[in-house]
Design a protein with these regions (language model features):
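N-terminal, positively charged/glycine-rich alpha-helical extensions of SAM-dependent methyltransferases
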Residues: 1-7
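Signature of N6-adenine DNA methyltransferases within the class I
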Residues: 10-24, 42-50, 64, 70, ...
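Glycine-rich helix-loop-beta junction characteristic of Rossmann-like nucleotide cofactor-binding loops
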Residues: 27-33
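Secondary-structure boundary motif
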Residues: 31, 58, 86-93, 175, ...
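Conserved beta-strand elements of the Class I
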Residues: 37-39
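Class I S-adenosyl-L-methionine
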Residues: 53, 78-81, 85-92, 197, ...
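Conserved S-adenosyl-L-methionine
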Residues: 55-66
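S-adenosyl-L-methionine
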Residues: 84-120
């Protein structure tokens, strides 16, 4: 996105996903369903959701796809719309029914009730998803931010917004639904993420983690030196005694196709 400066991206915690990473993430997901629902919160130009849908269509006989994306950056929305118009035309030519919604509202403020354990407040099944794929924004939120106030059950200290995206997404999965995120590694340790970890690991069984050995390569175009990981998991509906997590690693994105386990 040459129209957005690196300074503006950093201020918004906005780092656009390289195509190589989008394809790698989409390759970790699969389904046998004919009717699929996908959520891409913080979608940017829809690189992730487009890569995922392309992958799913190649894998199986898909009859219909429902896609919901969230993006609040008015400078990006035009590109988001262009990408989805092109995707819709491509799927139409393949005989696939495709419905999509672009939400310009704040993802957290619109969906924080998904964190609730009260059945009366939980999202309807129709509002849940088979797949959630995301490269959310990364930045710390002040304690008086409205998004912090509505997510107090997973906040301890000053949270990073990406953890709120992950937690809320966990509550928006269908039964047997899967999510995959590329996020900083910071959630894995430290007091500030304690309540988030308790909630997220209680709701999601992590099945795959990809580690990058270098900080420089992942979002090189945005001049980012952030330690990031790719995390995949599925909704936990019952206790599984024999849980196995596949861990792979690469130096960066140039050797993703040769990622080692």
């Amino acid at each position: 996105m040459s129209t957005t400066s690196n300074e503006a991206k950093k201020e918004k915690g906005q780092f656009f996903t390289p195509v190589e990473i989008a394809r790698f993430m989409s390759e970790q997901l699969s389904t046998e369903k004919e009717d699929i629902s996908v959520l891409d919160p913080g979608c940017g130009t829809c690189v992730l959701s487009c890569a995922l849908i392309e992958r799913l269509v190649q894998l199986c006989t898909v009859r219909s796809i429902r896609l919901v994306v969230y993006e609040t950056d008015s400078g990006v929305i035009a590109y988001t719309k262009q990408a989805l118009i092109y995707l819709a035309e491509t799927l139409k030519n393949q005989g696939i029914n495709f419905d999509y919604v672009i939400c310009e509202d704040d993802f957290i403020l619109q969906n924080y009730q998904a964190l609730s354990s009260s059945p009366s407040l939980l999202q309807k099944d129709a509002d849940k998803f088979d797949f959630i794929i995301s490269n959310p924004p990364y930045f710390k939120l002040p304690k008086d931010d409205s998004r912090v106030k509505v997510t107090q059950q997973i906040v301890d200290g000053q949270p990073n917004i990406y953890s709120l995206f992950m937690a809320i997404s966990a509550g928006l999965l269908n039964k047997s639904g899967e999510l995959i995120f590329i996020v900083p590694r910071s959630f894995a340790s430290g007091r500030y993420f304690r309540l988030f970890r308790e909630y997220f690991l209680g709701a999601i069984d992590i099945s795959f983690i990809h580690l990058f050995n270098t900080r420089k390569d992942t979002f090189a175009k945005d001049d980012v030196l952030q330690e990031t990981v790719i995390v995949k998991g599925f909704r936990r509906d019952e206790m599984i005694n024999d849980r196995r997590i596949c861990i792979s690693y690469s130096e960066g994105i140039t050797d993703l196709n040769a990622a080692r386990q």
